[in-house]
Structure formats: C-alpha cells, structure tokens
Regions:
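Bacterial signal peptide processing site
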Residues: 11-15
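Short acidic/polar inter-strand loop motif in beta-rich domains
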Residues: 94-107
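Sec-dependent bacterial lipoprotein signal peptides
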Residues: 1-10
Length: 130
C-alpha cells in the first residue's frame, strides 16, 4: 500500500506556497460555463475530502483558499498529505467560489481522485449556487 501512495505522489507537483513544503500537490483548473466575470474579491476554496464512510460526514483532509483568483479557467494547487490518497479510501476534490461571503459557484458532483489519477491535471467544473 505504501508503494501505491509513493507511486501516486511521485508524479505530483511538489510546488506550494507553504514555506518548506515538499509534499505532493493536486493541481488543475476550475471552470464554469456561465459568462460571468468574477469580481476581484472572489475567493476560490479547494478541499480534498475523504468520503469513504457513507454513514459519516466527509473528512476534510486538506483545504486551501485563494483570494482574487482571476478569471476562468482558474488554476489551482492543493497540497495534501501523502497518506491522504490511498487505494482503500474514496477521496474527492471539491471546489467553491465565494463572493462577499456567499457561495456563487460550487462543484455539484464528486470529482474522485485515485492513486492513478492524482498525478494528472484535474479539471473541476462548477455550477452557479442555487
């Protein structure tokens, strides 16, 4: 199992804004179809969740927020602990865009990340919040 984690982490980017961080990073883009520009005070929040147990709330493995992310496609890098993505867990990436403290866009479907896909660029689509 440790070998699978190491293989999964080997291809990940190891660049992070955290000083001294040398661990794996999930990377990719967040996009939406709406023809709406984001204001400068928008906040993009990315979370890696463990949703293995269906009878329990999701466990937040890591979270990162970026203020003023620009316009779509929004590039992201989400550092995570190497042991977070394992074959025996179901892990998903969640994206949310907030403006003035209110959710404007969110990812309505689970974006599953596995040991095989974690090293590839992730493409997360978000939809307008209800």
């Amino acid at each position: 199992m440790a070998a699978a984690v190491m293989l999964g982490a080997a291809g990940c980017r190891s660049k992070s804004s955290a000083p001294g961080y040398r661990g794996p990073v999930i990377f990719g883009t967040v996009m939406y179809k709406a023809r709406i520009a984001l204001p400068p005070d928008a906040v993009l929040t990315m979370r890696l969740l463990d949703v293995t147990r269906r009878d329990a709330p999701a466990v937040v493995l890591t979270e990162k927020s970026v203020s003023g992310p620009g316009q779509p496609p929004l590039a992201f890098e989400l550092p995570y602990p190497p042991e977070a993505v394992r074959p025996d867990r179901r892990t998903v990436v969640e994206a949310r865009i907030e403006v003035a403290g209110r959710t404007r866009f969110y990812s309505p479907t689970a974006h599953v990340v596995t040991t095989e896909t974690v090293m590839q660029p992730q493409e997360i689509w978000v939809e307008p919040a209800p």
